[in-house]
């Protein structure tokens, strides 16, 4: 990825501590070699959610649900997230992670293409 180092440093400076369940899911995903968003992407998403305050979000590619949970935690209460996953092995893991994070009502997972 080509990103100016100053921008990456700035985005990392915005990073605040995540909620414990996100840290746990991140560690599990990394241990299982499941791709999740990078730290600077997390920081950027948090800033964009604060600025835009969306009421609907569509995510293509759920994986284990890490980014959907992140967006759910940092978006307005009335925001609803729809995420789509077609890899059958990850769907139950994502659903379990949504439950762990208390996000079952805020996040809808659609299975398939």
Regions found by a protein language model. Name each.
Residues 1-113:
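A short alpha-helical cap/connector motif
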